[in-house]
From Swiss-Prot:
It comes from the Bacteria. Mg(2+) binds at D81, D123, K124, E491. The keyword 4Fe-4S does not apply. The gene is ilvD. The modification N6-carboxylysine is found at K124. Belongs to the IlvD/Edd family. Its cofactor is [2Fe-2S] cluster; Mg(2+). This is Dihydroxy-acid dehydratase. Pfam families: ILV_EDD_C (PF24877), ILVD_EDD_N (PF00920). [2Fe-2S] cluster binds at C122, C195.
Length: 611
């Protein structure tokens, strides 16, 4: 049996000094034989998705100690992508994922912790902690802060649901008055929690359920609802049990790499495609798979995207449906249940809470259980009161949504689309692939051709859109915004939002080697690989070149002959792969360090040391 890692610092005469320091943290004689559990929190007052987490780490710690463990809490950083959006702050978002993963590794290995509870929530925090968990491969349970309630505003005697994207779009739309914009701003983000649509944060928290590393309801139970407290309480007890099973019973099945196996990654990606999750999840799953030493690639994502239908459409793909509605329909277990019935997932896999996914679905899928407890759990509703306090309300819907024909979650037979919510496109413009969230693309533009309007940065693209330089039929091409070229691979939420505000959301395309917020929709194609800074073809496109996009056939093609491209490449090699215009962008030493090691989006934008 493997020894408890913590014995390195708690046992033996020569560890008297370390024990003295442990005692100074509150440990007593009887604690030195117990598992030491790291409570990895991410509380910060900068981020609404994390503002309510301050006391939740200690809630988990108390439960760990009541279960017979020793709990020690520390915090990671957390960047709010929405606040960092639209300026150079976004350069730091993706690189922060690597810092979070490293900081968890540093703390856990430096202090020889035996297991972890990861309290995450927003965009890069869950992926960073997931990467760390798979890197360390010690028992872990994920429990996130939960989604925000959808905003609501009453106009013309009708209730309109809102989220962050509505505020961005309205601000750039001249048809809205200043008072209307202010009303949307005040109502769009009413509570603590991760933004209310199927954006990156909620997508990733849902995927931890599919990977088997979190409890049912983790991705969909509202941050404000009292039901969410149970997840934190159970996580504290569960992690102690997992630690004992591994260290005292030599049960390796409880380890993250045993649970988040290759077929579990397939399940997670299948879920993501079925619910039209954020394209950022592709980056993060690829990165996490590398930490787990699993050969899960863009080719696997492409394969899955061709056979998985869209079973759930949530904002931004459907602005009337938010995470609170997904929860009412049975949450992630409800979607997985329909994928299981369609034969699209592997249910023989273990989870942290159940022997197999199949057994978990038998208990937690609202369409196959008669459990009053489960139906009550998924009836949790928004409170409708602005608050930054977790578990502050207990409101419930009168019933859960089990309609799989016209409800929020559909069966395969009644899918929103038989073609999946994410697609990988290949062609001479993206030889290693690029990603589009098809769930957010109108059917009328699944095939699209148009002239490229070239921008060497997100900033100039925003100005071009707002100043009326983009017309219907154009393709906005933003380059040198990849992991190296940005550096940091900025999200393009403002350009996509401004296209919508100008009435061009269904009349234009946007292509970039950067990435998109989970809040983006429309014909938005990102992660073009290789990126321009790596010598990718996207760096050779010239103003007015025609680009052909064919989502049904998974193709993207620059209509320029090979000989001309070869000439352009030779010219570019002489001048270097850099923007054609000088950018007013200060790149710090920290960002330069990331850029020097960053791989392409096709590899998850992880760092790779030079050979």
């Amino acid at each position: 049996m493997p020894p408890y890692r913590s014995r390195t610092t708690t046992h033996g005469r020569n560890m008297a000094g370390a024990r003295g320091l442990w005692r100074a943290t509150g440990m007593k004689d009887e604690d030195f034989g117990k598992p030491i559990i790291a409570v990895v929190n991410s509380f910060t007052q900068f981020v609404p998705g994390h503002v309510h987490l301050k006391d939740l780490g200690q809630l988990v710690a108390r439960e760990i100690e009541s279960a017979g463990g020793v709990a020690k809490e520390f915090n990671t950083i957390a960047v709010d992508d929405g606040i960092a959006m639209g300026h150079d702050g976004m350069l730091y978002s993706l690189p922060s994922r690597e810092l979070i993963a490293d900081s968890v590794e540093y703390m856990v290995n430096a202090h020889c912790a035996d297991a972890m509870v990861c309290i995450s929530n927003c965009d890069k925090i869950t992926p960073g902690m997931l990467m760390a968990a798979l890197r360390l491969n010690i028992p872990v349970v994920f429990v996130s802060g939960g989604p925000m309630e959808a905003g609501k505003v009453v106009w013309d005697d009708q209730v309109k649901k809102l989220d962050l994207v509505d505020a961005m779009v309205a601000a750039a739309d001249d048809s809205y008055t200043d008072d209307q914009v202010k009303a949307i701003e005040r109502s769009a983000c009413p509570t603590c929690g991760s933004c209310s649509g199927m954006f990156t944060a909620n997508s990733m928290n849902c995927l931890t359920e599919a990977l088997g590393l979190s409890l049912p309801g983790n991705g969909s139970t509202l941050a404000t609802h009292a039901d969410r407290k149970r997840l934190f309480v159970e996580a504290g007890h569960l992690v102690v049990d997992l630690a004992r099973r591994y260290y005292e019973q030599d049960d390796e099945s409880v380890l993250p790499r045993s649970i988040a196996s290759f077929p579990a990654f397939e399940n997670a990606m299948t879920l993501d495609i079925a619910m039209g999750g954020s394209t950022n999840t592709v980056l993060h799953l690829l990165a996490a798979a590398q930490e787990a030493e699993i050969d899960f690639t863009m080719a696997d994502i492409d394969r899955l995207s061709r056979r998985v239908p869209v079973l759930c459409k949530v904002a931004p793909a459907n602005n009337t449906v938010h995470m609170e509605d997904v929860h009412r329909a049975g949450g992630i277990m409800g979607i997985l249940g329909q994928l299981d019935k369609a034969g699209l997932i592997n249910t023989d896999l273990p989870t942290v809470h159940s022997e197999t996914v199949a057994k978990a679905l038998d208990h937690w899928d609202v369409t196959r259980t008669n459990s009053d407890m489960v139906h009550k759990f998924y009836s949790a509703a928004p409170g409708g009161v602005p608050t930054q306090v977790a578990f502050s309300q207990e409101r419930r819907f009168d019933s859960v949504d089990t309609d799989r024909e016209k409800g929020v979650i559909r069966s395969k037979e009644h899918a929103f689309s038989q073609d999946g919510g994410l697609a990988v496109l290949y062609g001479n413009l993206a030889e290693d692939g690029c990603i589009v969230k098809t769930a957010g693309v109108d059917d009328s533009i699944l095939k699209f051709s148009g002239p490229a309007r070239i921008f060497e940065s997100q900033d100039t693209a925003v100005l071009g859109i707002l100043n009326g330089k983009i017309k219907a039929g154009d393709i906005v091409l933003i380059r040198y915004e990849g992991p190296r070229g940005g550096p940091g691979m900025q999200e393009m939420l403002y350009p996509t939002s401004y296209l919508k505000s100008k009435g061009l959301g269904k009349a234009c395309a946007l292509i970039t080697d950067g990435r998109f917020s989970g809040g983006s929709s429309g014909l938005s194609i990102g992660h073009v690989s290789p990126e321009a800074a790596e010598g990718g073809t996207i760096g050779l496109v010239r103003e007015g070149d025609i680009i052909d996009i064919d989502i049904p056939n998974r193709k993207i093609h620059l209509a320029v002959d090979d000989a001309t491209l070869a000439e352009r490449r030779a010219e570019q090699e002489e001048t270097g792969w850099k923007p054609a215009e000088t950018r007013k962008r200060k790149i710090s030493t920290a960002l330069k360090a990331y850029a020097s090691m960053a791989t392409s989006a096709a590899k998850g934008a992880v760092r790779k040391l030079p050979d």
